[in-house]
UniProtKB/Swiss-Prot annotation:
Natural source organism: Limosilactobacillus reuteri (strain DSM 20016) (Lactobacillus reuteri)
UniProt-recorded name of the protein: Ribonuclease HII
InterPro entries linked: RNase_HII, RNase_HII/HIII, RNase_HII/HIII_dom, RNaseH-like_sf, RNaseH_sf
Binding locations of a divalent metal cation: 78-79, 170
Single GO molecular function: RNA binding
EC numbers on record: 3.1.26.4
Length: 256
């Protein structure tokens, strides 16, 4: 009879990552309800882990294809901030290694702030290279948001020390002399694009939280410049700030 306590068995199961581990057989016939519950929880955890690994590998298929076809440096690209009434559009290019294995990397919109912050630090640390480019509100007003996004993306690529052999871009085709694959919802289909989306969002969110101190009353730390009720109330009360986009409605109504 297994003399381990249920707590000891649970702790041991937390260290096991393989269903063929011999220890599982030693506790399989333990009739204690707590042990059987712990085994079921372990099996569910491993099933979720396997599902996450398969999803990760599926999101790495574009990078693997281009590596296998002679490309060395593949840059995933994404942007954050095309829709807000205030603040910049931020773009990012990320080049990853083939051994990159942060399974949690996915579309930044599906992650909590805590998850994004942790992944941001890991991506910046583990990526071959990360490049960020920004266009502020005056440039957006001058060029239009789509052109300003393309411009920032191209600058992000040109700032890379390693010239990419191929680009994987989320939705926005670029006028640049590098072969590229454009994916709709690319941050859900490519690990490199997802990594770029996380870095771009964390970078922009940090900027907007700083702007919240400079321009209080609009809720920038919470709404990141999007047109929430609090933001619109701030515009009504105080007018537009220098970081508001004059070409985005309803901002022109609140220009002094």
């Amino acid at each position: 009879m297994n003399k381990e306590t249920i707590s000891q068995i649970k702790a041991r199961l937390q260290t096991i990552t393989d269903t063929t581990d011999p220890y599982l057989q030693t506790i399989h016939d333990d009739s204690r309800k707590g042990v059987q519950t712990a085994i079921q929880q372990f099996e569910r955890r491993l099933a979720r882990q396997k599902e996450a690994e398969e999803a990760f590998n599926n999101r790495f298929k574009y990078e693997k294809y281009y590596w296998e076809n002679g490309c060395q440096y593949i840059a995933g690209m994404d942007e954050v901030g095309r829709g807000p009434l205030a603040g910049p559009v931020v773009t990012c290019a990320v080049i990853l290694n083939a051994d990159f294995d942060l399974i949690g990397v996915t579309d930044s919109k599906q992650l909590t702030r805590h998850e994004r912050e942790n992944l941001y630090l890991r991506i910046v640390d583990e990526a071959v290279e990360v490049s960020i480019a920004v266009n502020d509100a005056p440039v957006i007003d001058q060029m239009n948001i789509y052109a300003a996004t393309q411009d920032a993306m191209i600058r992000a690529v040109n700032h890379l020390h390693h010239r990419p052999d191929h680009l994987i871009v989320d939705a926005v085709p670029l006028a640049i002399d590098i072969p590229q694959t454009t994916l709709i919802k690319g941050d859900q289909k490519s690990i490199s694009v997802a990594a770029a989306s996380i870095v771009a969002k964390e970078y922009r969110d940090h900027l907007m939280r700083d702007y919240d101190y400079v321009y209080p009353g609009y809720g920038f730390a919470q709404n990141m410049g999007y047109g929430t009720k609090e933001h619109l109330a701030g515009l009504e009360k105080m007018g537009a700030t220098p970081i508001h986009r004059r070409s985005f409605n309803p901002v022109p109504k609140y220009l002094n």
